[in-house]
């Protein structure tokens, strides 16, 4: 296991997410997520079935009624500019528009009554590291808050934030 930064994220090598994992491994991964908030597993070869099976180790999965879910897998939300039949989607396609909105800062499923504990992303096809675009970034909002000066925390204490699914569709 390699730290990706001092306080946030680890890379775990030689771990096959397509294989069944035991309770000790589940507990180790759950604890690592809770302490480091982000795990990167490189060089995975997953299909919809074993991706869903791996994620079910951590709890019930959300389902997605939207038309851009992965074919036959209600629990896998497909983020792509390519349709199921391999055609590039038009810039005016509703799925492309929604994904452009997701390119802004957001927290997955924060608008749900019971928000997700984890989000698991699997890149089937990604750009080379030197390419522009396609970079997903992660942040540790707990650490960001802890690092605030006390006067800022006092200012934020009485405030409430609303995360709305409808707002991202504007």
Positions of the model-derived regions?
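Non-heme Fe(II) oxygenase catalytic core, chiefly the N-lobe of the double-stranded beta-helix
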Residues: 1-170
